[in-house]
Amino acid sequence: MFLTHLEITWKIKIMENKDSEKLLKLLTKNEDEIIEYKVNNNDHERIGKYISALANSSAILNRQFSYLIWGIDDDSKEIVGTKFYPKTEKHGGEPFITWLERMLDPRITIRFEEYDINQNHVVVLVIHMKAGRPIAFNGSR
């Protein structure tokens, strides 16, 4: 069962972040070629592959942005929270986000946004696709 717009609005009413309306709109959408929900996936290589796939899907669909969202149950869209904190993650001693950006070719803009919703941590990765060619992660498209 999917949450209704009203139910999602109620769930994030405590949010203090000004971007809550943007998050609300994302949470009303089902997974598709440009939106992917995860709960606790912190496998760095897999995240990089997701970014490449989502960015390339954005290009094919002529969409500027795609999203990878942690802390949301795929099926119910319930806000369950995540233990993934990208801004403090490390990959081999290097900051995770720096490593991730370095592994993408060509470089694209990615932005991690973090929210606390009713004591549940939610992370939204915004992938801005503006490159004129397919995005590769670690040499693979």
Task: Describe these PLM feature segments.
Residues F2-R141:
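Conserved N-terminal catalytic/coupling substructures associated with nucleotide/phosphate chemistry
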